Regions:
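A short hydrophobic beta-strand element
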Residues: 72-84, 88
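Short, aromatic-enriched amphipathic alpha-helices that serve as compact interaction elements
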Residues: 1-13
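A solvent-exposed, acidic/Ser-Thr-rich amphipathic alpha-helical stretch
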Residues: 14-69, 79
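Hydrophobic/aromatic beta-strand elements that line small-molecule binding cavities or substrate pockets
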Residues: 48, 62-67, 82, 101-111
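Short beta-strand segments enriched in hydrophobic/aromatic residues
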Residues: 21, 80-82, 119-122
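Short beta-strand edge/turn micro-motifs at domain boundaries
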Residues: 98-125
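Short, cysteine-centered beta-strand-loop-beta hairpins and adjacent loop/turn segments enriched
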Residues: 54-55, 83-96
Length: 125
């Protein structure tokens, strides 16, 4: 499921984001990209779509993944390397980016596992 989240950056199949995240008041996300506030489901989906649509030639690597299961709750932590071309469609320009970061995803299991919270942040070079 975590790979599905980041594969959207390659496939641009944004409906997959709705399939793997729970649409409820309990959903939340945080990141080091503005806005810095705690985001709800609809805000997170909109920002994820904007981010992934703005990066062409997207690729990622998940390293040092640790998964812990506590009944119907799962916690996944890992280091994340992302790269691609950040595209400005209005100015017809692009900039190569490489982001080294870390991530925590909290999952809950109802009928199937879904993301209920995630936190992404960059590691300073």
């Amino acid at each position: 499921m975590i790979q599905t989240f980041f594969e959207v950056g390659k496939t641009k199949n944004f409906s997959a984001l709705r399939d793997i995240q729970i649409d409820s008041e309990e959903f939340s996300s945080l990141s080091d990209v503005p806005p810095y506030s705690l985001k709800n489901y609809s805000e997170s989906i909109a920002l994820e779509e904007l981010r992934f649509s703005s990066i062409s030639d997207y690729d990622y690597e998940i390293k040092n993944e640790k998964t812990s299961i506590f009944g119907t709750t799962g916690i996944v932590t890992f280091e994340l390397n992302q790269k691609g071309m950040l595209v400005d469609n209005k100015a017809y320009t692009g900039q190569h980016i490489t982001i080294n970061g870390r991530a925590t995803f909290v999952l809950i299991k109802e009928d199937k596992w879904k993301i209920v919270h995630y936190h992404l942040d960059k590691i300073s070079n």
